[in-house]
């Protein structure tokens, strides 16, 4: 038995105090995102990336990459700033073999020292998708166990993460800021203001290798069962979850704060 002597008894937090603390945390994070957007107004994508990696969140952020059609542009910039920044790839078990090959090519070319593959929990697959066709029956749940949950686990302990999203990709991303407050972290979008022509110019200027499926009409490349080539007048993400009432996998659609 141990004795506390004259120490005051511990005060357990009440539900109200916890709610207040959470609200304060959210407000502080939203304020930080607003400050970063003001700080990065007029900055180039490389300047935003360099500032985030070396000044604002040194050692406390990760890059999340799909290794899709445009991925080489952001990854090239990251390699110019730091080859040691963690590069997270969500390996759903449903990717095109071409994407896995492309991932290995880019990681080797850019010399990243901390590239990680995030996989779903085997227990979740056994429970929810033992036959491997959950994508056709419940695509939201499939994305949840294969993408959202593995990423959330990998981001524990980090303060920020970097994405390659751009405003031109869909109408839902038209107002995409450089910094967002989301799920207790800052999400950074250095390429938010880029257009498709700038992406193509970067590929040519830096002689970046194309995704093997790009020339087949794939512009947004996710899991093989849920991705198709796009038509001439479709936006770049029209080939994702075609025929379903779904446009995002879920890693970017949690409640903004």
For the regions a protein language model found, what residue spans apply to each?
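Nucleotide-activated chemistry modules centered on ATP-dependent adenylation/adenylyltransferase
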Residues: 2-257
């Amino acid at each position: 038995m141990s004795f506390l002597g004259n120490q005051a008894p511990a005060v357990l937090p009440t539900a109200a105090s916890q709610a207040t603390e959470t609200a304060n945390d959210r407000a502080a994070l939203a304020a930080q995102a607003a400050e970063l957007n003001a700080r990065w107004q007029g900055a180039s994508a490389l300047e935003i990336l360099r500032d985030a990696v070396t000044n604002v969140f040194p050692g406390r952020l990760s890059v999340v990459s799909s290794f899709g059609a445009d991925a080489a542009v952001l990854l090239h910039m990251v390699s110019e700033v730091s080859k040691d920044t963690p590069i997270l790839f969500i390996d759903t078990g449903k990717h095109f073999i071409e994407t896995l090959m492309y991932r290995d090519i880019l990681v080797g070319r850019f010399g990243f020292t901390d590239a990680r593959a995030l996989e779903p929990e085997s227990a979740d697959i056994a429970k929810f998708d033992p036959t491997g066709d959950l994508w056709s029956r419940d695509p939201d749940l499939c994305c949840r166990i294969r993408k959202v949950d593995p990423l959330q686990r990998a981001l524990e302990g980090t303060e920020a993460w970097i994405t390659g999203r751009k405003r031109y990709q869909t109408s839902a991303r038209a107002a995409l800021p450089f910094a967002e407050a989301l799920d207790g972290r800052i999400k950074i979008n250095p390429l938010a203001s880029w257009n498709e022509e700038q992406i193509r110019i970067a590929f040519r200027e830096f002689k970046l290798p194309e995704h093997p499926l790009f020339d087949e009409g794939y512009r947004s490349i996710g899991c093989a069962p849920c991705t198709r080539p796009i038509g001439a007048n479709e936006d770049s993400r029209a080939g994702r979850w075609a025929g379903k009432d779904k446009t995002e996998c879920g890693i970017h659609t949690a409640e903004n704060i």
